[in-house]
A protein has these predicted regions:
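Active-site-proximal beta-strand elements of phosphoester/diester hydrolases
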Residues: 228-233
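Hydrophobic, aromatic-enriched interface-forming segments
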Residues: 137-139
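N-terminal beta1-alpha1 cap of cysteine-dependent amidohydrolase-like domains
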Residues: 1-129, 142-144, 149, 153-182, ...
């Protein structure tokens, strides 16, 4: 008989940051790791394998279970990934960019901030693709040394980038067609926004590649990397698969390199998975 190895292409492994929230179902009420399923669906529909990355802590004892270990835990998690999505959510703590909190700024969530900053640092260290959405884009800017406008509606000439409580606002954005995400979406796009904060001082090493009509920064990239993109809008809300697909494809290249390295190390061993042909 002739034995032929089975090779099954694997989906790029995409980590999605999540948050902790109080949820209830049936008779139960618990703090849970939460994330809108639209993120998961968009990653899966774009060919990726979504993996959730919740911040770890102990709500009952009121302390963080892994205090001081965020960097090492994030490095372990990111070592398993081909790409990272920093998802939307609550305001970033202004203390991270050395400013006092505005009256309109939401309460700090140090557990999530520390965890996602550690995930981002580990992803950049491994140079895997990063897609940062809304809060994620703001956190990315802060990680690069930038700051935020804490309440955009208070700025003269600025539009409200929300459509009302729990309602996304459709807004046109102008994009640089020669840079991400414009190379994927074109020179302009109508997007779904829901943010009251925005990027103020741009982080070192980042480039603005998209703006709203009022001048608000809506897209930024680290041009020194193959794919490190932040968008202020919510592509998952519209199931905007073009951006997710470009991201997952970039992550696929990381997976292919890793798979090739593993295969090279295993060339001396016969495959354990075989098909026998007469």
């Amino acid at each position: 008989v002739t034995k032929t190895s089975i090779t099954t292409p694997r989906r790029p492994r995409i980590g999605l940051s999540t948050y902790r929230d109080h949820v209830s179902w049936g008779p139960w009420a618990h703090e849970a790791a939460a994330l809108p399923t639209t993120y998961v669906d968009c990653v899966a529909a774009s060919g990726g394998l979504p993996l959730l990355l919740p911040p770890s802590g102990d709500a009952v004892l009121g302390r963080q279970a892994y205090a001081g270990q965020e960097a090492s835990l994030a490095a372990e998690a990111v070592a398993l990934l081909d790409g990272l999505v920093l998802t939307g959510g609550a305001d970033v703590d202004p203390a991270l960019y050395d400013e006092p909190a505005d009256a309109e700024t939401g309460g700090p969530q140090p557990l999530r901030d520390k965890w996602e900053l550690a995930l981002l640092a580990a992803a950049l260290d491994r140079d895997i693709p990063v897609l940062a959405v809304c809060r994620g884009a703001q956190l990315m800017n802060v990680a690069y040394g930038g700051s935020l406008i804490q309440h955009l509606p208070a700025r003269q000439g600025a539009e409200d980038h929300r459509g009302g409580s729990g309602v996304y606002r459709k807004m046109p954005v102008t994009l640089d067609p020669a840079a991400l995400p414009g190379t994927v979406l074109g020179p302009s796009s109508t997007v779904s926004c829901y943010h009251h904060q925005a990027i103020a001082r741009l982080g070192k090493g980042l480039t603005v590649t998209g703006r709203a009509q009022d001048g608000t920064i809506e897209a930024l990239v680290d041009e020194g990397r193959a794919f490190a993109v932040g968008v202020q809008w919510h592509p998952e809300r519209d199931h905007e698969l073009r951006l997710f697909t470009a991201f997952v494809q970039a992550a696929g290249h990381v997976g292919e390199v890793g798979e090739a390295d593993r295969n090279e190390k295993a060339t001396a061993r016969p495959s354990e998975k075989v098909i026998a042909h007469p």
